[in-house]
């Protein structure tokens, strides 16, 4: 691929903020996005922005008691577009951004900070009931049904006497029919655990040696295909989730991507083989996954095992001197993306030529 054919990552708009931004998410079916974080005075903030004539217009600012760590629209309908958030106090809230004074749903979900959140069953993505998953420093991963108050529908926690590990990232997947659904969770010690929500059982676990910063399936609403896990020390792993070997688990390929922590991974909504990784030195890398000729083979005992593919770097750019802490592709406009970094700047990016790859 020549330099002219390569995708380019262009910083379209950048805006400095007066608070630390932990997460940013596009509002579905709009040119708007929300940013979440905390003011220096210790309170939480949600801001709603719209792109207008190449600039950002602040539509709404909502201040809350506790700093807000993460958010998702994944469990809401396209009509309501409610935002679910996790905060430093362990609270899960669902907000109507049109009337944000009181949450439409509120539960003290965890004893400590909610580090990560994901949603499924909303926005027409994923079969089955809408659900939210939260992962916390208290070591637990909980699944919530927004229609059911107070109690989680599933609670994955260490058995008594086992060390509680800090859960840093959670992701839904495999929601291709009404029954099937999995949650994948990554922890500070490098553990990755795959929970089967239909059978309420641990389906698979592995350890990638370094703390797991971000996990994402290439698609939530199909039979599990690929899972990307990013970690401290600049590495990420791509697991082929189609074939599970009874002892070897899933085949994987790893790549040393950045010279520092890989904070985030996000797959392009319009092409599941492309994904962006965001690094601790302020860099973004755009990758393409190539499948092997055969995705499975038989081992010496005749049991099917997966075969990993390869990843190639399409483009990289350094946007900041600080870590890029959050990243979100627009579900509606191919190549449009928003990211936030710890230099208190939010950037709207355009990635070109993605339809040519």
Curated annotation (Swiss-Prot):
Gene Ontology cellular component annotations, sorted alphabetically: dynein axonemal particle; RPAP3/R2TP/prefoldin-like complex
Repeat (WD) residue spans along the chain: 63-105, 115-154, 162-205, 207-249, 257-297, 319-357
Keyword Repeat: yes
Known tissue expression: Widely expressed with the highest expression in testis.
Signal peptide: none
InterPro entries from the UniProt entry: WD40/YVTN_repeat-like_dom_sf, WD40_repeat_dom_sf, WD40_rpt
GO molecular function: ubiquitin binding
GO BP annotation list: apoptotic process; axonemal dynein complex assembly; protein stabilization
Keyword annotations: Apoptosis, Cytoplasm, Repeat, WD repeat
SUPFAM superfamilies, sorted: WD40 repeat-like
Described purpose of this protein according to its UniProt entry: Key assembly factor specifically required for the stability of axonemal dynein heavy chains in cytoplasm.
Subunit note: Component of the PAQosome complex which is responsible for the biogenesis of several protein complexes and which consists of R2TP complex members RUVBL1, RUVBL2, RPAP3 and PIH1D1, URI complex members PFDN2, PFDN6, PDRG1, UXT and URI1 as well as ASDURF, POLR2E and DNAAF10/WDR92. Interacts with PIH1D1; the interaction associates DNAAF10 with the R2TP complex. Interacts with several dynein axonemal assembly factors.
Protein name: Dynein axonemal assembly factor 10
Species assigned in the record: Homo sapiens
Upper lineage: Eukaryota, Metazoa, Chordata, Craniata, Vertebrata
Gene (name only): DNAAF10
